């Protein structure tokens, strides 16, 4: 009576991955790095803050150099000038590797989204920064489902229409 049977609505797989200042391993950083390293076609990211680990930053650059469509969407202006300056320090190398850098213009983009190959969607509370991976208590959902990934891809593309792409030659 108090615990009715849950109805199964889908066969899709959802994995919850936490992070925080506990334990030996940084599960969320490892899961994101593994997903990025195993991408074959597409890695699209929305994050308000981009202060990644060296491993994740390198994995994204290697993916772009290998011909994978890597897009990083950031707010044109975040809520912190210091964080903007720190985030921007990574972008020239990213662009030189072939990562498309997109600045969202209408307002402060606070979305945390990672789409891999139209098969994996990662959403949750974690930014793509070392604080979320190592210091803050965060949780992301890894959704292994093509339909969800395609829906998120359409949302990303809608947001991209509100962006300006930055190029290395006019960045400096």
Segments the model singles out, each with a brief description of its role:
Residues 1-172:
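Charged, low-complexity intrinsically disordered terminal segments
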């Amino acid at each position: 009576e108090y615990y009715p049977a849950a109805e199964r609505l889908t066969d899709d797989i959802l994995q919850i991955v936490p992070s925080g200042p506990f334990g030996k391993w940084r599960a969320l950083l490892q899961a994101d790095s593994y997903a990025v390293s195993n991408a074959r076609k597409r890695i699209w990211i929305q994050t308000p803050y981009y202060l990644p680990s060296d491993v994740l930053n390198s994995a994204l650059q290697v993916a772009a150099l290998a011909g994978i469509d890597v897009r990083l969407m950031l707010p044109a202006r975040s809520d912190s000038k210091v964080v903007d300056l720190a985030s921007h320090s990574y972008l020239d190398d990213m662009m030189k590797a072939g990562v498309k850098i997109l600045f969202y213009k209408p307002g402060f983009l606070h979305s945390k989204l990672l789409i891999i190959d139209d098969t994996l969607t990662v959403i949750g509370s974690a930014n793509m920064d070392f604080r979320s991976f190592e210091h803050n208590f965060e949780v992301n959902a890894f959704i292994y489902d093509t339909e969800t990934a395609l829906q998120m891809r359409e949302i990303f593309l809608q947001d991209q229409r509100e962006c300006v792409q930055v190029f290395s030659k006019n960045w400096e």
